[in-house]
Amino acid sequence: MIGGVDVSGLSFVTVHQVPGNILQGDWRAVWFISEEASDDQFDAIHDAFAGRLGGPLADLADLFGEVMDVKRAPITHATVQGKGRLLIGDVVSGEMEPYRSPDGQTITTLRDSLFSTVPGSPAYVAKASHNRVDLPDYDLVWSFEGRNAIQSDWTIEHRAEAVA
């Protein structure tokens, strides 16, 4: 729920370019919201990630120097123990497979590390078979194969508490 609007089952993805140190901000981005979102759901998700509702997402929003567009798109993503896939229409495609121990049984993770992308959650160390972005109208175009990748499970939840 965002401001009384149920956004269950919907996705938000940002495709962005970071010009230097990630914490210095000035990111250039195009944001994508699930194409099946109603207008109210779209607006609620946009408002949250634009920082208009405060909280940790407002801190994140401060890092974006320019959001060039916010678009509806078909978004498909799945992550299972470090193996991940992301598709956004025909403009973004990426897949990654986690590194494993020599016997192949244990997935390589980083915990409580500077390289963990989400504190308290394991970072899955992986190799991306491919990562392609084709957004020429925004000068966001690249295609990589066989590069390193890290991902984490991430959930944010806010529960309003009654003030006595």
Predicted feature locations:
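A short linear-motif detector with a strong N-terminal bias
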Residues: 8-12, 87, 120-121
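Short, hydrophobic/proline-enriched secondary-structure or compact coil segments at domain edges
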Residues: 31-32, 81-92
